[in-house]
Amino acid sequence: MVNVTVDPLTRIEGHQRISTEVDANGVITDAQSSSLIFRGFERILQHQDPRDAAFLTQRICGVCPLSHGLTATNALDELYGVAEHVPKDALVMRNIFQGLNMAASHATHIYVLWAPDLANPAYKKVLTPLGDTGNAVWDEMLGRFAPISYKMDGVPIPAGSSYLAAIPEKKRLQEMIALIAGRMPGPSALYPGGYTYPATVADITKLSTYYLQIMDFISAHTLRVPFDTWIENTYKASSPTKAVSFVTEHLTDLINKSTTSNDFSKEAGWGDTEFYAAFGSELVGEKLLGLPASLKHDTIGGYQDPSKICFVAYGGYYKPTDGYDPRSPAGDRIFTSGVVSGNLEYLKFDPDKITESTAHSFYQNSVNDLPPVKGETVPFTDPEKIVYTGGSDSQYSWDKAPRYDGIAGEVGPLARMLNIKEPLVTGLALALAENGYSPANVYTRMLARIQETAILAYELLNWVTVDYEPGGKISVPLDFNAAKDSQGMGLWEAPRGALGHWISTNGSGKVANYQCIVPGSWLMSPRDSNGIPGPLEQSLIGSKINPVGEVDYTNPVGIFHMGRSYDPCISCAVHTIDLTGKCAPNTLRIL
């Protein structure tokens, strides 16, 4: 057995350590996911004016500040008793804020944080021996996704075309948010009861111009099939079967045109989505389309025991009507709340079933498995107890372990797409399950994020040009007495998944307790009080460190793929580094 530790896992937000035990066949037999820093924002908020939460919590993360601000605002809407009266145009503008932030986050993750692993030399070793086709595929992967300042065998590699093109689009999306929310990051327009800035006709016109530029990027790089055709036949398809059939037929046409010429370029119709949809999956690429090889990403990052995992979504994006029910996100959200079991059975979401365990975390809470409204944040203060190398039976992470009805929950794009029964992602998950694969894996996780980005582009156009009406009512007044001895719950969807804020106030109307459960905690959590691993840990166990080719303990590209496929944000999950140096990483790999 070989210990393979990635410490830190780079190209994520924050500091993460993944330790694995690997057998002679390259299969991971045990894993620990350790978040290396402690978050103190809940303690900062105590004794503050509740309204400050909408601004202070944005400082938890610079990538998704709007998600925290909106979630806090949702909690404050309930605290002040105004959720059912928030004007329609305020809710639509909140949708626009979040949609732009989520699209920017997804674009950053897909192209800058995750895709560079497709230029890993491990794939060159597998593809180039396949002759002209293999060489053509490898050249495309390198030419699209290589990061800046990249070298292979000491030779500088030009940055990939898709990688470079995505960077200014991230900037453009940030500028769109700043135009209507005041600034980005840390927008100032959020406020309980609505929002503060009445966007003008000129603002909407400028947003529309920006939008067209974003669509130019999508059509040039992300999707070469016409965007409306893609949406109509996937997101709007009448069934999962029809959505999958559309994609496989489209890919078959591309393959028939490209195999003789070995032209897999964007000019030949191979957008980044089409390219990964075909070559990323063993089932789709090799077994359905007859390709000579694939990256086999559907064979890693899955779950061995469906009874120990579920897919949780709190719901996001309000319907364009006045008011909403903060405790029933299934009824008034475009992305509905819900829970899907590991066997793809649909269940009703109940927020009262959420708890957090600290059995394997660096906390000295008085009670384990607490509901978030009663949550405690009491960290270890003795450096001797903060050890990351004690194994699965020890305490080894600053992350707590959120659970839904006692079960680990994957959150994020895949969970959202499954819960809204999005035809393409649901169809792929069902097809994989029917053929003996885990329905959740690196391949479906990444395609879900790509598909969600396309859906957001579609929905944003409606929110900006149809649903929002300049000059409409954007807020309602607050009764500050309503916030005394009160509670509020904010449930929302951040780019990385389900995000919840819980607030309690005292008789003076100040914050008595504040708890956040963030997507990174759901995804990267350690084991719970029952010894059940978190989602990342479960997805690692049973997977190979190299999805293709020979076992290479020095280049475990499979671990990189699996860890980054969740788009973890440890900056959200935990927040103060160990300054003693006692627990400094003993292995440093910059990859």
From Swiss-Prot:
One of its GO terms (molecular function) is nickel cation binding. Induction: Expressed in methanol-grown cells. It catalyses: methanophenazine + H2 = dihydromethanophenazine. SUPFAM superfamilies: HydB/Nqo4-like (SSF56762). It comes from the Archaea. The keyword Magnesium applies. Mg(2+) binds at residues 42, 575. Composed of a large subunit (VhoA), a small subunit (VhoG) and a cytochrome subunit (VhoC). This is F420 non-reducing hydrogenase I large subunit. It comes from Methanosarcina mazei (strain ATCC BAA-159 / DSM 3647 / Goe1 / Go1 / JCM 11833 / OCM 88).
